[in-house]
Amino acid sequence: MQLNSTEISDLIKQRIEKFNVVTEARNEGTIVSVSDGIINIHGLADVMQGEMIELPGGRYALALNLNRDSVGAVVMGPYADLQEGMKVTGTGRILEVPVGPELLGRVVNTLGEPIDGKGPIEAKLTSPVEVIAPGVIDRKSVDQPVQTGYKSVDSMIPIGRGQRELIIGDRQTGKTAMAIDAIINQKDSGIFSIYVAIGQKASTIANVVRKLEEHGALANTIVVVASASESAALQYLAPYSGCAMGEYFRDRGEDALIVYDDLSKQAVAYRQISLLLKRPPGREAFPGDVFYLHSRLLERAARVSEAYVERFTNGEVTGKTGSLTALPIIETQAGDVSAFVPTNVISITDGQIFLQTELFTAGVRPAVDPGISVSRVGGSAQTKIIKKLSGGIRTALAQYRELAAFAQFSSDLDDATKKQLDHGEKVTELMKQKQYAPMSVFDQALVIFAAEKGYLKDVELAKLADFEEALLSYARGQFADLAKEIDTSGAWNNEIEAQFVKLVEDFKATQTW
């Protein structure tokens, strides 16, 4: 078959017309070094701080060091098979995680992927993990309580919705137990909970999830896990992921509580990443921006105004404030609260609950030290009845500690001192509480009332726990309406006081202690 020149030119023209040119610009680079989960990339032109970089095999790395001729990125996941010369691509996206009510009752990893074997999560929305905290104008003052269910905390160190209250202490002093009990106490309060586990053993986390499920609190809780076996990058990012999930509720006029367990391990993970990225070390080998690491996280816990919620939801939610309350946990070494990370977090938060090893081993649990534990903004959020009744509790405990130390050197004490010691001893005993047994407002108020009004003078110290249990059981049976009213309103007036007096006196008349 022979073609003349005209036919050949026509065929070429047809082919040219039909030829579909697809141009796709890809921001591509090459891995030049891989070590300890850190990759250096050459050739990526436009990269943002914190951008997701796509790696071979569907994995991602996070761009953290932006140098003149290279990019330092930390791999999120396994990195053993990455090699020099591999091609990587910039995505132009900041890390986002799924958010929304679909995550409640689930256990997820740092990236929001389910790890509980209950199937995929059909979340409709995603949110960036790094968000600027609400400004001063967008905030409201903290004046609504978060009941932890602990007598010692709710009476002496009250926590409000939108507050940041640090739980600090040595290892094995009950920090996680306190945070888990606070979450369990929210199951009927309308507050959603997020528990972020950072650098813990998988067995410990599994135990926490099981306890939440047993006590019916998992259904309104999201558990975010970055266990000890996961990379430093995922441990560093886990609190920000959990915070983004909590902000979903805050920004829509709901209330949420987030526990970071614990930020010491997050700081260590960030130190590891920073040193591998060859950033200059500072005090205790932490990088210079370790304060900013925690401040930008904890400032996102806030109570936001009605106008902020209305603006965020485009008018769908009106007249409601939202809040995110944070309970960060810090582990100290031999009670040293003056170390770098503890002092940073103490200065960022609105107060701290200090748990002491000496108290814990002496059987005072929760091991709260009332001397150096404080809540800077929770007082205005405290329930009215608890605020009215608990004024003398902290004083009684402080005086008792002082006198107990003095009494060791003196055998003959006057009657007033003996009374103070006896009262302080009984208040200390009364503040003890079992794990997984948070108390309602009414129960706390009744026990504190009995202590403050002198109804425990004739009760032996050894029988105090039985007295408390019997009193609460009697009150729930005979004064159910009063209990319901106080649990709902938290009010205090002369009429309620008279009913309390009648309740305790009737109880003491029926039984001998």
UniProtKB/Swiss-Prot annotation:
Record's bilayer topology term: Peripheral membrane protein
Keywords recorded for this protein, A-Z: ATP synthesis, ATP-binding, Cell inner membrane, Cell membrane, CF(1), Hydrogen ion transport, Ion transport, Membrane, Nucleotide-binding, Translocase, Transport
UniProt subcellular location: Cell inner membrane
Family statement: Belongs to the ATPase alpha/beta chains family.
PANTHER family in alphabetical order: ATP SYNTHASE SUBUNIT ALPHA, MITOCHONDRIAL (PTHR48082:SF2)
InterPro entries per the UniProt record, alphabetical: ATP_synth_asu-like_sf, ATP_synth_asu_C, ATP_synth_asu_C_sf, ATP_synth_F1_a_nt-bd_dom, ATP_synth_F1_asu, ATPase_a/bsu_AS, ATPase_F1/V1/A1_a/bsu_N, ATPase_F1/V1/A1_a/bsu_N_sf
Protein name (record): ATP synthase subunit alpha
UniProt: ATP binding residues: 169-176
